[in-house]
Amino acid sequence: MNWRSEHIWIELITGSRKISNFCWACILFLGSLGFLLVGTSSYFGRNLISLFPSQQIVFFPQGIVMCFYGIAGLFISSYLWCTISWSVGSGYDKFDRKEGIVCIFRWGFPGRNRRIFFRFRIRDIRSIRIEVKEGLFPRRVLYMEIGGRGDIPLTRTDENLTPREIEQKAAESAYFLRVPIEVF
């Protein structure tokens, strides 16, 4: 969602609360729970899940490996659920031409540096840079080049934009900020 007027442009960033993250967290949780239940049912010799008879799976080595995969999957699943609940990576980009200030805010992991906030002047922005890497896994990222601070990405690296979409976004940003576009 974006909000734009003549002098202010606010772009909201989704972060980790994407549908794909919800799907992966659910699939991983259910799959690892299944592995753990099958492994423990082979240990106890009882059917905790009616889909697989526990007599067909020997505890050593198959049951141990399934328990290990189940526990590892539950840890990874809990990590995904935590990043979703903490909304890691979400925030906003605010460009204010009237004040001459750019604010970039993102939520991070809990702790001392949970709030990631950059603030700088529009006149410090040198250019909007498009980085394109073609090949088997193409990558197109939009950066804001700032004097003395380096480059700040404006698009996520996992956001697969088409060449037309990345050009459109770069043109809108460069036009609003009145800076040139560079392509690498």
UniProtKB/Swiss-Prot annotation:
GO cellular component: chloroplast thylakoid membrane; photosystem I
Gene Ontology biological process: photosynthesis
Localization terms from the record: Plastid, Chloroplast thylakoid membrane
Predominant location category: plastid
Organism: Nymphaea alba (White water-lily)
InterPro entries: PSI_Ycf4_assembly (IPR003359)
Database matches in PANTHER family: PHOTOSYSTEM I ASSEMBLY PROTEIN YCF4, PTHR33288
Keyword vocabulary terms for this entry: Chloroplast, Membrane, Photosynthesis, Plastid, Thylakoid, Transmembrane, Transmembrane helix
Protein name: Photosystem I assembly protein Ycf4
Ranges annotated as spanning the membrane: 19-39, 57-77
Pfam families the UniProt entry points to: Ycf4
Protein's membrane topology: Multi-pass membrane protein
Membership in a protein family: Belongs to the Ycf4 family.
Function: Seems to be required for the assembly of the photosystem I complex.
Coiled-coil segments on the chain, per record: none
